[in-house]
Structures are given as C-alpha cells and as structure tokens.
C-alpha cells in the first residue's frame, strides 16, 4: 500500500530545516594541502571547536593520527593568506606554528620541537626539502626591520635552525622547487604593483657546492604572463603552468626552450592566493595527472608528455584541487553538488575510490539539498556572465500558491576567485528554508580564461556589480524568483559588490556584508604588502586612483542607499579593517535606514570559530525575516536592528 505524502504550503523563508546554523558550523571542517609521503598521506584539518586551529593529520597502514596536538596551529601568515604551512617527508614533518611563526619539527608520535629562533619577526611558507644539505628551502617574510612592508626572500633553514638568504631583491617569491638531483632550484617571483595572476617570472639557478644559488637565469614570464606551479618531472625536466595563450596551460622547459605541452581552452592553474597549491603531479616521466577547469567546472585527466594528448578520468567531482600522486595513487580534494569537499585517494590501477576525510562527516538527507544549475545570461555591454542557480529544496514544504521565492545573490570574494558547484551547507541553509540562491561568477572570476579574468581590470565595483544585478533581473524576468524580494550578500571583495549594488542600483531590497570593502582609499592605506597595489589593477592607475576611488567607494555615496543592511566584522581583521564596516554603519544610522552590526572578537578575515558561524547565520536569517515581514521562529535569537519598525 502506498501512502500519499504532501508538502505543506508555507511562506518561503519560514520553512523548518534540519540544516541549522549549528549543523553548518559543525560541518565546516576545513581540509587542506594533502601531501603523500611514500604510502602515507598527510593533510591539514581544521578544528572549529578549537578556535579554527589547523592540525596536521597522517594516514598510513596503522590508521589515522594527529601529529600536531593542541595548542599547535599549523598555519603560515606569509602574505597574510598563508598556505604551504608544512612539509612531510620520510615520516618527519616541518611546520609553521601560527602563534609564534616559528618552524617546528615533529617525527611520528613525538612532541614538536622548535627549529628556528624565537622573536625573530620571520614568517615561513612553501618549504622544499634539500636533504643532501640538511636544510629546507622556503619563502621567508621578514617583519623585523621596522619598514612599512616586510622583506620577502628565498631562504635556507638548516636543520639546526640557521637561516641563510639564497635569493633576494624581488618584492615576492613563491614555489621554490629543487630538481631531483638537487643541483638546480626553480622559483617564481614578481614585483609590485602586480598580483601573481597578472604577471610572474620563472627563474632557474644552479646550486653551488656551498649551497648558494648561482648562474641565475630567467626562463619565462613577465608583467603580462602569469606563471604558477613549477614542478620537476622524475627525469629532471622543468614544467610549469602559464597563461601566455590566454589560458593557464601546461608548458615545459627543455634544451633552453619553452614548449607548450597541452594547449586547450581550459585552466590548469588557479590564482596563487595561497602557497602550496597543486593542480598537477607526475605519475611518471610520460604521464601527468592534472585537474583542469572548463566553464567553471573541474575535471581530472592524464596528459601525455609525448604528444600532449589529454585523457579524461572519471570522478564524482566537479571541483578538484591539490592534486598529488605517489606511485599510482592520486590524492586530491574533491567536491560536487551533493559532495562536500573531501580528501580522496584514487588508484589509477583500478581500485575503488577511497575517502580519507570528510569536511562534513554527516550529510543531511539529499532531499534537503538543492542541486545547482549552471547558467549563463546576458549582462551589461553585451557581456555574458556565469553563475550557479539553486532553487529552494525541502521535502516537507512548498511555497504558497502563486508565491515565488526570495532570491539571495552571492558575490564571491577575491575578487579574483570563483564560485563552484561544490556542496556548501552555508548555501543549503538558505535553500532548505525557501530561499533561492544565485552564486555568481562575475566578469573577473577565474575558471574562464585570462580574458574573462581581466574583465575586472580597472572595473571592480562596476562589472561585478552589473553581473550580479543582471543575474537577479534575469531570474526575475523568467519567473523563477520574486522581483520584490531580491537580496545580495558577499564577503570581503564580495562585500564591495554588495555595497555598490545597493548604492548604485535599485534592484535589491536588502543586503548583508561580511567584512566588506566600503572605502577603496582606506583599503589602500590599511592594506598589507601582498595586496598593497591590488587596487591599481582593480580600479585605476595611481594618477587617476583618488578620483576613481571616490567615484566607486560606497561610503562616498551613502546618500543613495535606500535598503536595509546587516554588517558582520571580525575585530582582528588586518585585510579589511573594522573601520570599513563601521563607516557604512554610521552612514546608514545617519540616514535612519534599518541597519544591524555584529562584531566578533578574536576573528580576522574569515570567521573560523563555530560560535561565530552560528551567530552570523542566525542573525542574517533573523534580519531577512524581519525585513520581509515573515514570522520569526521562536528559537531564533533576536538581534538589534536599528531604525526598523516593529
């Protein structure tokens, strides 16, 4: 006998969901930087219940164990964004401890011991082992000199802690890579005002008997070519990724010449916001296992070094990062619409895929999960923009008759970054309550080639905003969402998109800004070295900067705001300081517009603590429900919304 079930007609936004803010916070276990070590595999795993501490895990034949117990926090602060915070080789791990920036060494189940001296003002990242000389080679960032900005170098760190500068003179360095025979060192460097996805240089030097780097020569790159991930093949041939063709493709350097290895309208690289990323690895001298992105979706494949042919490999993933290999075993981080990011091992010899770690150990029932639809739509000036659209999904509820759902448009951070289709409980939190979501890959996003990425050059606050506005209008026009209940949210650079959309366009009814940029001039004044000239690329060259800053900074156009807003700000944020949010809050207060402001102590750029995730999500939901006059659940904590009628 079949029992008929029916959904309860309930206003969108008022649906009850098992995906609570606490579930989102508990499920958000960051996984990063897998690293094979023979038959073992290491990776970093976040502890939201411990203030966001990152710990080093190792899995081998004896099981899984933690190498860096509390209070150790395996994070680098080089460039502020870090990455490349540890190295695992031969059962020994070297790592950067966030609290003091010193390098530590730990072996098996022993206690970590400090390698470098205390209180030097030095930070380290992106290590490579130079075993023959009893040292590591790393990127060092020196904050001890009292200058406006730190000094970046390539540095040798002896096993005894002694530090020796190997390469200096450029503003930034990354990816030191030692050849298999230990005789050559490749590295990347770049200069202000460039970011590493604008222009980098690949250098090669010989390692002298005393360990110094000599006979240095420029291999490829410059101001108009972005190179990333230099790697040596097992036979000692240098490979790298370059966007000289308009796409981040694979190249190799042999016989004093650079050759394209696999030319394709696809991205084999990603922006170097963090150290230590890996989109390809060598299975052998003849085969490269790689992740590549086409139209914002990742794939796994094998490139032949003989003819450059690409053979796709079937995986369940649409977002693939940090590809590593040991023998036939590929290790990667993968995600998909119904798969949260997970650490997986794939045996190229044919054994079943094995998942070593889940970012969300316990997933909600799939009936509560909205599966995104990749869409493209027309935007301003004849452009085509791209996004992932999520319709509301909940097996227990349906909209009221003739009701269309409210829409939340998300502008990703960066802004040189991208939205993916990977399962994010923070998105499902909204869709399972009756909100539709549009996650926009606006012009300037990665995953669509250099030309699309460069659409944001001198156009930040314009192109990104236009593409978000166009996406909302497109969905309203085709009858997918309620044109009178359009919302926009974003963090960091996406926060500028939110504020600009509300200041310069009359489309969205409310917005949420997470540590968003409101004053471009202030961002310039307060920014750290890595992003100190990023604005020159995003907005205008120095001679026109001040005029453009004033023209595009929402703080100077706050009189145009007509919509309620909620702001979230970490008080320890060094990337986008609290003043950026506070000035906008004061401006809305002065106009008597509805505004809410939540500050979080001990949080920086991005919220790591579970309590912070819960507080902000619940506050944002409460804010939207109050703005739209939807009944507020009794168990949802109230927040103060100034100037909003009861």
Where is each model-derived feature located?
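Sequence/structural signature of beta-propeller modules
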Residues: 1-40, 46-55
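A short beta-strand motif characteristic of beta-propeller blades
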Residues: 19-25, 65-76, 112-117, 162-167, ...
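Conserved beta-propeller blade repeats
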Residues: 26-40, 73-93, 120-136, 170-185, ...
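Non-catalytic accessory segments flanking enzyme active sites
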Residues: 28-35, 44-45, 54, 66, ...
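A flexible loop/linker signature enriched in serine peptidases of the S9 family
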Residues: 45-55, 74-80, 95-103, 117-123, ...
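Short loop/turn segments that connect beta-strands within beta-propeller blades
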Residues: 60-62, 107-110, 158-161, 207-210, ...
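Cap/lid segment of the alpha/beta-hydrolase catalytic domain
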Residues: 193, 359-484, 491, 524-526, ...
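Active-site-proximal cap/loop segments of hydrolase catalytic domains
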Residues: 442-646
């Amino acid at each position: 006998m079949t029992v008929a079930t029916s959904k309860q007609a309930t206003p969108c936004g008022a649906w009850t969901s098992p995906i609570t803010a606490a579930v989102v916070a508990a499920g958000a276990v960051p996984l990063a930087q897998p690293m094979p070590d023979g038959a073992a595999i290491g990776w970093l795993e976040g502890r939201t219940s411990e203030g966001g501490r990152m710990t080093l895990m190792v899995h081998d034949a004896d099981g899984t164990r933690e190498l860096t117990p509390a209070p150790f926090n395996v994070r680098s602060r080089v460039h502020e964004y870090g990455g490349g915070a540890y190295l695992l080789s031969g059962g020994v791990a070297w790592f950067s401890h966030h609290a003091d920036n010193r390098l530590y060494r730990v072996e098996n189940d022993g206690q970590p011991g400090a390698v470098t001296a205390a209180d030097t003002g030095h930070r380290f990242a992106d290590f490579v082992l130079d075993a023959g000389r009893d040292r590591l080679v790393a990127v060092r960032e020196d904050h001890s000199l009292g200058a406006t900005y730190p000094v970046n170098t390539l540095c040798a760190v002896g096993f005894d802690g002694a530090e020796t500068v190997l390469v200096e003179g450029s503003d930034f360095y990354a990816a030191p890579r030692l050849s298999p025979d230990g005789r050559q060192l490749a590295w990347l460097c770049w200069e202000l005002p460039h970011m590493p996805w604008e222009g980098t240089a690949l250098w090669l030097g010989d390692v002298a008997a005393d360990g110094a780097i000599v006979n240095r020569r420029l291999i490829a790159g410059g101001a108009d070519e972005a190179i990333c991930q230099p790697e040596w093949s097992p036979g000692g041939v240098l490979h790298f990724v370059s966007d000289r063709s308009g796409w981040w493709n694979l190249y190799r350097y042999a016989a004093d010449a650079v050759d394209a290895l696999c030319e394709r309208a696809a991205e084999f690289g990603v922006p170097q916001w963090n150290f230590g990323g890996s989109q390809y690895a060598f299975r052998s001298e003849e085969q490269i296992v790689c992740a590549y992105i086409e139209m914002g979706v990742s794939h796994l494949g094998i490139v032949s070094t003989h003819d450059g042919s690409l053979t796709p490999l079937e995986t369940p993933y649409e977002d693939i990062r940090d590809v590593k290999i040991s023998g036939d075993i590929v290790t990667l981080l993968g995600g998909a619409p119904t798969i949260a990011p997970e650490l997986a091992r794939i045996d190229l010899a044919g054994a079943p895929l094995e998942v070593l770690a889940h970012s969300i150990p316990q997933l909600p029932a799939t009936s509560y999960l909205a599966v995104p639809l990749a869409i493209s739509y027309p935007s301003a000036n004849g452009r085509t923009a791209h996004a992932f659209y999520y319709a509301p999904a909940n097996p227990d509820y349906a909209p009221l008759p003739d009701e269309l759902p409210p829409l939340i448009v998300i502008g990703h951070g960066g802004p040189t970054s991208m939205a993916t289709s990977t399962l994010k409980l923070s998105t499902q939190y909204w869709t399972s309550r009756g909100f539709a979501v549009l996650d926009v890959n606006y012009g300037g996003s990665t995953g669509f080639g250099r030309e699309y990425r460069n659409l944001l050059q001198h156009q930040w606050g314009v192109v990104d905003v236009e593409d978000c506005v166009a996406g909302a209008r497109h969905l309203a026009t085709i009858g997918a969402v309620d044109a009178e209940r359009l919302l926009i949210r974003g963090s960091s650079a996406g926060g500028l998109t939110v504020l600009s959309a509300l200041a310069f366009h009359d489309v969205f009814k409310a917005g949420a800004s997470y540590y968003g940029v409101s004053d471009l001039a202030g961002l310039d004044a307060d920014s750290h070295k890595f992003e100190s000239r990023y604005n020159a690329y995003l907005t205008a060259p120095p001679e026109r900067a001040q005029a453009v800053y004033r023209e595009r900074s929402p703080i100077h156009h706050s009189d145009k705001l007509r919509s309620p807003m909620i702001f979230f700000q970490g008080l320890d944020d060094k990337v986008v300081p609290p003043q950026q949010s506070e000035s906008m809050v004061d401006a809305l207060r002065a106009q008597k517009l509805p505004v809410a402001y939540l500050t979080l102590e001990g949080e920086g750029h991005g919220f790591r603590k579970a309590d912070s995730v819960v507080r902000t999500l619940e506050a944002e939901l409460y804010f939207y429900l109050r703005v739209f006059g939807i009944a507020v659940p009794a168990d949802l904590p109230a927040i103060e919304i100034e100037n909003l009628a009861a």
